[in-house]
């Protein structure tokens, strides 16, 4: 697709599916191959009864990729897409991993106590530390902590539900980020997902590494 092939959706419909995720899913399935904007997603995600706009629509969008296996592309994937533009090129879904398990209530309380009721995500020596009920300064919306397998679910879906050492507390944004780091089909690092998530300089650094590795020049 080049910039002249971009076809924008003119979908201004409201959607009445039960959940935010289902409403966003319906929007994309009704507009396959068309560019959908942030405002269209928010409109579709809005509760049809109360008119309330969801804070966490972006997380539900990411879950359509990671949990349901849809291909939804953004500017990180295609240069012709501007920020806040998305496209679902087809409705084919990748296979899902085995059903997830959750820690027991007692185990989860121990995890939260260890974490001081804050997100335990660590990256480049930086600790997230967002507390339940905070407003996420990057992703927006109210922080809700949920349990995450220390070992990726795709590698060991039968994590011990009674062992707090096997679990960590993550905010919604970092739950999605971790899912993007791992390929649920084979339990290996999702290199493409990581490259999509990094900034332009890091993409160029990766390109330079590969060019040097293969003895090529720009």
Swiss-Prot record:
Q: Which reaction does it catalyse?
A: Endonucleolytic cleavage of DNA to give specific double-stranded fragments with terminal 5'-phosphates
Please give the coiled-coil regions recorded for this protein: none
| Enzyme Commission designation | 3.1.21.4
Q: Which domain of life is it from?
A: Bacteria
Q: Which GO terms of the molecular function aspect are on file?
A: type II site-specific deoxyribonuclease activity
The answer, when asked if Hydrolase is one of the entry's keywords, is: yes
Q: What class of enzyme is it?
A: hydrolase
* Gene Ontology BP term (one): DNA restriction-modification system
Respond yes or no to whether keyword Ubl conjugation is given for this record. Answer: no
Task: Name the residues that span the membrane.
Answer: none
Keyword entries, A-Z: Endonuclease, Hydrolase, Nuclease, Restriction system
Q: What is this protein called?
A: Type II restriction enzyme KpnI
Q: Which organism is it from?
A: Klebsiella pneumoniae
């Amino acid at each position: 697709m080049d910039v002249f092939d971009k076809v924008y959706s003119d979908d201004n419909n409201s959607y009445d599916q039960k959940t935010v995720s289902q409403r966003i899913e319906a929007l994309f399935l009704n507009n396959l191959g068309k560019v959908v904007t942030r405002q269209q997603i928010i409109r579709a995600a809005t509760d049809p009864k109360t008119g309330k706009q969801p804070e966490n629509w972006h997380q539900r969008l990411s879950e359509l990729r990671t949990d349901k296996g849809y291909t939804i592309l953004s500017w990180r994937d295609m240069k012709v897409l501007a920020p806040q533009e998305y496209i679902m090129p087809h409705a084919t879904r990748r296979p899902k991993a085995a059903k997830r398990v959750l820690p027991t209530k007692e185990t989860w309380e121990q995890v939260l106590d260890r974490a001081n009721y804050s997100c335990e995500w660590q990256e480049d020596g930086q600790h997230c530390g967002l507390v339940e009920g905070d407003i996420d300064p990057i992703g927006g919306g109210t922080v809700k902590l949920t349990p995450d397998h220390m070992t990726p679910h795709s590698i060991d879906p039968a994590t011990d539900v009674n062992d707090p050492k096997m679990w960590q507390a993550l905010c919604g944004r970092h739950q999605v980020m971790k899912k993007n780091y791992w390929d649920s089909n084979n339990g290996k690092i999702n290199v493409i997902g990581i490259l999509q998530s990094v900034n332009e300089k890091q993409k160029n650094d990766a390109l330079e590494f590969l060019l040097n590795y293969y003895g090529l020049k720009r």
